[in-house]
């Protein structure tokens, strides 16, 4: 089942195209990694897909009313700092303020706490946590929204290696349970290992879409990222470890 459809989506800043004529679909049971160098348009694409910024073309999410959108997609932006001095539990409950179906909200919140490793943090004050811990709180808030689709902008940025791995595994588990997950990433190795589909952007354009083995090729990495990588297959998935910058481009 398709949860998000983009048709010829474009965003311009003045005369400059930031996202240029992108068409794609995100389905249930998919963990999709959105990758590309700095300035490729990843954040802009996510915001346009949600209808948060002006765009041309079509996004199936942006067409929905705010109520329908809040029931369809949860959003975790790149900004991580929490400025309200309330408990972790109260912060996560903010994800359920939008109208929702009649579900066991306490069970959903407890599940979000458990998935993000915050069960013992529920009474801690959010503003007193570290940056990485606050990122996990905001992720739990998005999970508490209990939507079929999750969009997250660099959700593992600033996390320690162990938490990055557990967070990526959690996203994979959510996809296996029937959700669609679209996340932007800078770590190509984690994207290749955990994601079921890769979307590679270059200068705002869709360069390649497909499974990691198909997309994380020397040709694509050299053209888009100007790097060479070590490739291997394991029982955990594809390894794609950057090892060499080909030439300075600045």
Language model feature labels by segment:
Residues 224-250:
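ABC ATPase nucleotide-binding domains
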Residues 150-153:
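Catalytic Walker B motif of ABC-type/P-loop ATPase nucleotide-binding domains
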């Amino acid at each position: 089942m398709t949860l998000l459809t983009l048709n010829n989506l474009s965003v311009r800043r003045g005369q400059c195209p930031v996202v240029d004529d992108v068409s794609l679909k995100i389905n249930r049971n998919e963990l999709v990694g959105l990758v590309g160098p700095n300035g490729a348009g990843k954040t802009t694409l996510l915001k346009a897909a949600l209808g948060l910024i002006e765009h041309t073309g079509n996004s199936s999410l942006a067409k929905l009313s705010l109520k329908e959108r809040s029931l369809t997609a949860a959003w975790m932006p790149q900004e991580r700092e929490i400025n309200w001095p309330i408990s972790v539990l109260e912060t996560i409950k903010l994800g359920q303020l939008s109208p929702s179906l009649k579900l066991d909200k306490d069970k959903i919140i407890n599940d979000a706490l458990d998935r993000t490793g915050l069960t013992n943090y529920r009474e801690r004050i959010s503003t007193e946590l570290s940056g990485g811990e606050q990122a996990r709180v905001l992720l739990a808030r998005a999970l508490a929204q209990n939507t079929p689709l999750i969009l997250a902008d660099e959700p593992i940025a600033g996390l320690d290696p162990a938490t990055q791995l557990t967070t990526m595994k959690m996203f994979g588990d959510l996809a296996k349970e029937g959700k669609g997950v679209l996340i932007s990433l800078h770590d190509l190795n984690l994207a290749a290992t955990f994601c079921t589909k890769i979307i590679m952007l270059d200068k705002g354009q869709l360069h390649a879409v497909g499974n990691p083995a198909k997309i994380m090729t020397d040709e694509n990495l050299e053209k888009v990222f100007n790097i060479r990588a070590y490739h291997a297959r394991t029982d955990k998935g594809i390894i794609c470890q950057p090892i060499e910058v080909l030439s300075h481009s600045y």
